[in-house]
């Protein structure tokens, strides 16, 4: 593993390795020790007591953060007719049909999220090998395969984030930018925690949130006490 740079080491020294911080303390500290030359993203990582290999312990969904993410999401909507008009009216960046399938196959990726009406999934499905590995495939669980394209586009633009448990049982989510007020970051943090608590699989045994941390784009992780949320 490559040795971290001096700025990272200096940031690390300001974290008490033996302490588990409250959500408020962790967010304040993450903001204080951030050394990026840009408005870095603040991210939370949950280590959950689930077995993702089991179908009944999969966790996936999306949540609208009350204070947004600080990032403007570019939305591509696959729809036709009235639904295409609705998507355009809602502020989608791109709206179309098979012409975008061709563009994406040719390497065009100037979007962050895809929304599709169910009748368009036959077309979008052709892009499975391209979109799947990038996590861009629309999915009913995250509200991106829907007839209500207006709601989908509005929520994404308002600060909707998707979450998904990985093979190791971790869930990562962005909760805003370093420039956000700490209180707004904590409110977003609590929103993510609440939705994950509600998503706890009935089959999950033992401690649900095993580890919890806050970090910035290049910064070290700061341990958080789940009880503080």
UniProtKB/Swiss-Prot annotation:
GO terms for biological process: regulation of translation; translation. The keyword RNA-binding applies. Transmembrane segments: none annotated. GO terms for cellular component: large ribosomal subunit. GO terms for molecular function: rRNA binding; structural constituent of ribosome; tRNA binding. It holds the Pfam family Ribosomal_L1. The keyword Cytoplasm does not apply. SUPFAM superfamilies: Ribosomal protein L1. Keywords: Repressor, Ribonucleoprotein, Ribosomal protein, RNA-binding, rRNA-binding, Translation regulation, tRNA-binding. Belongs to the universal ribosomal protein uL1 family. Part of the 50S ribosomal subunit. NCBIfam families: rplA_bact (TIGR01169). Binds directly to 23S rRNA. The L1 stalk is quite mobile in the ribosome, and is involved in E site tRNA release. HAMAP family: Ribosomal_uL1_B. This is Large ribosomal subunit protein uL1. It comes from Listeria welshimeri serovar 6b (strain ATCC 35897 / DSM 20650 / CCUG 15529 / CIP 8149 / NCTC 11857 / SLCC 5334 / V8).
